[in-house]
Each structure stands twice: as C-alpha cells, then as structure tokens.
C-alpha cells in the first residue's frame, strides 16, 4: 500500500497511463531503497521421545536448521524426555515420520508458530528462482 502525498496535474501531459507508469516507477525505486528481505515462519517444537533417541533427534533438528532450546524429563510420560526446539516451518513437513522411525513408534511431537526470521541468503536465491514470474508492468 502506498499513499501519494503530492502531485500535480497538467491537461496536456497528464493521463491515467502516465500516472500508472509514474506509480510503477516510484514503487520499484522505493522497494529497492527499502532493501527488502524474505522472512520464514519459525515454530516452537516439542518432541516427546525415549531417552535413547535424544542424540539422533538432536542431529535431525540441527540438520534441519533448528535450535535445541532444552531437554527435561517428561512430566506426562515416565521414562521419556521432552525436547524443546525452534525450527523453520518448512523443515517440519515430514518430522512426524522421522520421529516415529527414530523412536520406533514411541515418540511424538507438536509444533506451534512462534515468530518470523530472515531467510538465510543461501536459500533466498532458490526461493526467488522458484517464485512465479509476473510481467514487468501489468497496467
């Protein structure tokens, strides 16, 4: 959304098309000056798992750009560990299957949106390359 703060009209040089083109150029210049970045959703993940599987699950979380926040004995299930982590939402898609495989069906997890973080630059180019293309000016 943009708000035009000042402008002028001339009966010969002003037309709807001229204003549309001026708005398009101003938008592109403003966007470039704003230095935009891509954000990705980060989720809080809570994994309940058997004690023997904690190392393997921590490896999975780290490989998926996650951060382990802490581990505690589970208050809900005796002999189990509760692992808290933050992970990008895009890395959680098949986590249920992975947790079940590593824990031999004993583990489970929950995920809840927490905040947004800037997408790493290494992944930004891939996202941009795979984004749908729009015409330069759709007037």
Stretches found by the model and what they are:
Residues 1-139:
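Accessory interaction regions appended to the cores of large information-processing enzymes
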